[in-house]
Amino acid sequence: MSHFAFEQIGVIRSPYKEKFAVPRQPGLVKHGGGELHLLTPYNQPDAVRGLEAFSHLWVLFVFHQTMEGGWRPTVRPPRLGGNTRMGVFATRSTFRPNPIGMSLVELKGIRCHKDQVILQLGSLDLVDGTPVVDIKPYLPFAEALPDAQASYAQHAPAATVAVTFTAELASSLALLEKRYPHFAAFVQEVLSQDPRPAYRKEEEPGKTYAVWLHDVNVRWRVVDGGFEVFALEPR
């Protein structure tokens, strides 16, 4: 059996500071963009020459927060309610023999300054600090296949949960919107995807949850089948 060693070429900077509530695919949270910072010695403008002519990129990365758990031959995809087992190679689970993921993201711009090369990205599904091992331009003629079949994931999941904020958060939201434009919409988009594990989605009303988005601890509770955000606690 052959073994290969790869070097990290970059790192992701995103508003998702923990695994919980990271979208399961890119494009689901419109306001959840981020950046890819190239590392030395790959942070050279020549390395991205011509990349600005492409609208989207494949980002290949490492599942660095789950790799210690090893791989599993079968997993339970969230899209199937967390109860049905599928072979790991029939899913995009993080528990793979090689902890490599791939994400298709929009390239919104490239910023080069001194020793920095930063790719500005659209909607992400990656946690802050994710190691990147390669990037490749997306080629629509070869990779957009309208007749492709995708079993249980043929269509994007619909936002399933209504998200509201308590009236007491109005002033806090106004301040956060100045620091993070569209912050309220971002929080609603993230939570509307219902990040709870499938086995917890039948929990009693009033159950509370929290997640770090940007540098804000967002706390919410289950109310009448929806989510009510009741606290926004900056770090």
Regions found by a protein language model. Give the residues of each.
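Short coil-to-beta-strand transition motifs
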Residues: 2-8, 95-105, 214
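Active-site-adjacent substructure of cysteine-protease-like catalytic cores
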Residues: 49-101, 193, 201-205
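Basic, Lys/Arg-enriched alpha-helical interface segments
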Residues: 52-55, 158-235
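Short, solvent-exposed secondary-structure boundary/capping segments
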Residues: 114-124, 228-231
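Flexible glycine-rich active-site/ligand-binding loops centered on an Asp-His dyad
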Residues: 119-153
